[in-house]
């Protein structure tokens, strides 16, 4: 789902169709073959550059995983890992990317953390951590606006269900996992501030 499961308590998170963890490589290859994306003599049907968020080794490994699984269906992925300022400029200023591994903070309400990644009004060249995919859907925009102002909890949940259905169908972003940050604490540990 495009909304974090953290919104489950508010009734805004919907369980959307989930795709198998292992995937069906034969079916994926057939879909691409049928769409006219034939493999060449080296088994490559297309090439893509994949920009990785430069926040450490976990993100590099995530990119290597995507490179491996897409390679199984003939998509040759080149990984690009740059320093933070270069990555920010490439993704949010120049829109100079094909695919991008990133994550979203959804914060305490979808208006704060979801709208900025999908609303047409959030296509703001040079502004970090907004709609860098430049996804635009007038129907979704109307629903985002309705979700922002609807005071009735049940009606608001219905609006966000429709939002999640549109995003599941259009897939401007492929959500691979839900990231949870850990907090480790011990009363014996003092003076960290």
Feature-to-residue mapping (PLM):
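Short, well-structured beta-strand/strand-turn elements
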Residues: 72-85
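Bilobed "Venus flytrap"/periplasmic-binding protein-like clamshell domains
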Residues: 25-29, 52-67
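Surface-exposed patches in mature extracellular/periplasmic domains of secreted proteins
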Residues: 40-41, 79-81, 159
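Detector for C-terminal structural segments
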Residues: 1-17, 58-68, 85-193
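Short, well-ordered beta-strand elements
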Residues: 45-54, 78
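Immediate post-signal peptide segment of exported/extracytoplasmic ligand-binding proteins
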Residues: 25-49
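DNA breakage-rejoining catalytic core of tyrosine-based enzymes
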Residues: 17-23
């Amino acid at each position: 789902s495009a909304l974090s499961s953290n919104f489950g308590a508010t009734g805004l998170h919907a369980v959307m169709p989930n795709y198998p963890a292992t995937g069906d490589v034969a079916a994926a290859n057939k879909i691409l073959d049928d769409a006219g994306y034939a493999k060449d003599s080296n088994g490559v049907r297309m090439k893509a550059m994949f920009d990785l968020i430069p926040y450490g080794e976990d993100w590099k490994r995530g990119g290597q995983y995507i490179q491996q699984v897409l390679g199984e269906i003939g998509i040759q992925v080149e990984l690009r890992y740059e320093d933070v300022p270069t990555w920010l400029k490439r993704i949010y200023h120049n829109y100079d990317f094909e695919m991008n591994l990133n994550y979203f903070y959804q914060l305490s309400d979808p208006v704060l953390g979801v709208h900025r990644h999908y609303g047409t009004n959030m296509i703001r060249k040079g502004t970090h951590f907004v709609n860098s995919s430049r996804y635009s859907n007038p129907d979704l925009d109307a629903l985002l606006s309705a979700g922002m102002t609807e005071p009735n909890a049940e009606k608001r949940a219905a609006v966000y269900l429709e939002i999640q259905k549109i995003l599941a169908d259009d897939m401007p972003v492929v959500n691979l996992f839900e990231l949870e940050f850990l907090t480790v604490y011990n009363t014996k540990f003092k003076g960290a501030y």
